[in-house]
Amino acid sequence: TSYGNGVHCNKSKCWIDVSELETYKAGTVSNPKDILW
């Protein structure tokens, strides 16, 4: 499920798809991998 701003949730896990973040698109995020929490 996508909540916008790159945030997705699947069951109890949420993550940020950094490819969807404006900061990533602007080249200010160096790590292309998802940020999990």
From Swiss-Prot:
Described purpose of this protein according to its UniProt entry: Bacteriocin active against Listeria monocytogenes and Lactococcus cremoris.
Question: Does the record's keyword annotation contain Cell membrane?
Answer: no
Indicate what this protein is called per its UniProt record. Answer: Bacteriocin lactococcin MMFII
Family matches, as Gene3D superfamilies: 1.20.5.130
Per UniProt, what is one Pfam family of this protein? Bacteriocin_II
What is the organism field in this record?
A: Lactococcus lactis subsp. lactis
Record-linked InterPro entries:
Bacteriocin_IIa, Bacteriocin_IIa_CS, Bacteriocin_IIa_dom_sf
Which GO biological-process labels does this protein carry?
Answer: defense response to bacterium; killing of cells of another organism
Starting at the broadest rank, the lineage of the source organism is: Bacteria, Bacillati, Bacillota, Bacilli, Lactobacillales
Cellular component per GO?
A: extracellular region
What does the UniProt entry say about where the protein is found? Secreted
Q: Mainly resides where?
A: secreted
Instruction: Provide the family line.
Output: Belongs to the bacteriocin class IIA/YGNGV family.
Taken from the UniProt record, the cysteine pairs bridged by disulfide bonds within this chain are C9-C14
* Key words of the record: Antibiotic, Antimicrobial, Bacteriocin, Disulfide bond, Secreted
